[in-house]
């Protein structure tokens, strides 16, 4: 091969690599800009343009499960502020009464309390059905749920067998049965909103939170599928995927990445009617978009390794804080 031919060949190879690099750069830039637009639109523009749900056109009552603390209580108060009467469903009657009085006094709406334990037998849904059957239901927030006390290996969870049964009942059965209770009412009215609280951990398998993240995947999949079944009937069913929120369950303090329940709900409600799946809080949206990209472009084994390493760090901090012996070193 002559020197001239070699130069041409090298030039062609360099040109191909340059164009491939440009193509990759343009594709990544497009994805970043699309995520930026998605976040900007769902956080700010949709609400300003009136593209969100018209809450005033829904039924008069909103049902919120797990409503005495955290995200559930914040949703109850936010919906009461919009004029909904509130059905508060949770385990402890005294706490329910306290929240009910607070809401009635602050927002001049009616409340109704139903004290049931979602980890018990399924006959609780007959009790709930009797309490809500005559109500004009506009909104259901499926917030009740339970998680690990700390990141842990599946077989080393304290009272693991009982916990696994309770976790499935609280996170999976409750969401399914409550949705099945209110959907016929909403279908008859031709309108309604169901908000199912899942988790950012539902985007990919999460080692050391394996059972919890698996239940939240169920909530996400159920929500997206049922939304598609009922969207033509005027019913909005949205999956809500929060990151870290400062609640009694998480035992985390507010920070840049850990928001208050009130802040989370404020942002999440701006996305109802705009997107089928929301991360709610702006920082959680950023985390969600990054995680989506990692899932799409990195091998699954690497994503699992990243998640495992992150949760292992959290687990070690907990063990150190409470002086526990870590046998998994």
Task: Give, region by region, the residue ranges found by the protein language model.
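Residue(s) in the substrate-gating loop at a strand-loop-helix junction
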Residues: 199
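Conserved glycine-rich Rossmann-like NAD(P)H-binding loop of the short-chain dehydrogenase/reductase
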Residues: 82-98
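Rossmann-fold scaffold of SDR-type NAD(P)-dependent oxidoreductases
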Residues: 65, 115, 137-150, 171, ...
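SDR active-site lid
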Residues: 221, 227-305
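Active-site helix of classical SDR
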Residues: 179, 215
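Catalytic Tyr-X3-Lys loop
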Residues: 137, 146, 155-177, 187, ...
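Conserved mid-core segment of classical short-chain dehydrogenase/reductases
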Residues: 122, 126, 130, 145-165, ...
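Conserved glycine-rich cofactor-binding loop
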Residues: 61, 68-69, 92
């Amino acid at each position: 091969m002559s020197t001239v031919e070699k130069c041409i060949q090298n030039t062609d190879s360099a040109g191909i690599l340059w164009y491939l690099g440009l193509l990759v750069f343009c594709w990544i830039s497009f994805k970043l800009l699309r995520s930026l637009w998605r976040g900007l639109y769902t956080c700010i523009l949709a609400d300003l343009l009136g593209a969100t749900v018209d809450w005033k056109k829904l039924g008069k009552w909103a049902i919120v499960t797990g409503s005495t603390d955290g995200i559930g209580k914040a949703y109850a108060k936010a919906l009461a502020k919009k004029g909904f009467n509130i059905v508060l469903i949770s385990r402890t009657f005294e706490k329910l009464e306290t929240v009910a009085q607070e809401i009635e006094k602050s927002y001049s709406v009616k409340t109704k309390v139903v004290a049931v334990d979602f980890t018990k037998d399924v006959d609780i849904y007959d009790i709930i059905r009797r309490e809500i059957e005559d109500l004009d239901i506009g909104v259901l927030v499926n917030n009740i749920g339970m998680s690990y006390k700390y990141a842990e290996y599946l077989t080393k969870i304290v009272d693991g067998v009982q916990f696994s049964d309770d976790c499935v009942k609280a996170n999976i059965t409750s969401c399914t049965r409550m949705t099945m209770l209110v959907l016929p009412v909403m279908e008859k009215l031709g309108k309604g909103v169901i908000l199912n609280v899942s988790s950012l951990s539902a985007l990919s398998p999460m080692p050391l939170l394996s059972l919890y993240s698996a239940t939240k995947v169920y909530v996400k999949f159920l929500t997206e599928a049922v939304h598609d079944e009922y969207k033509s009937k005027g019913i909005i069913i949205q999956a809500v995927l929060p990151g870290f929120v400062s609640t009694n369950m998480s035992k985390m303090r507010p920070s840049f990445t850990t928001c208050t329940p009130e802040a989370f709900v404020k942002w999440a409600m701006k996305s109802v009617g705009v997107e089928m799946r929301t991360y709610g809080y702006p920082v959680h949206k950023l985390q969600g978009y990054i995680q989506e990209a990692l899932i799409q472009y990195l091998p699954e084994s690497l994503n699992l390794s990243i998640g495992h390493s992150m949760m292992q760090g959290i687990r070690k901090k907990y063990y150190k804080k409470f002086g526990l012996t870590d046998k998994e070193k």
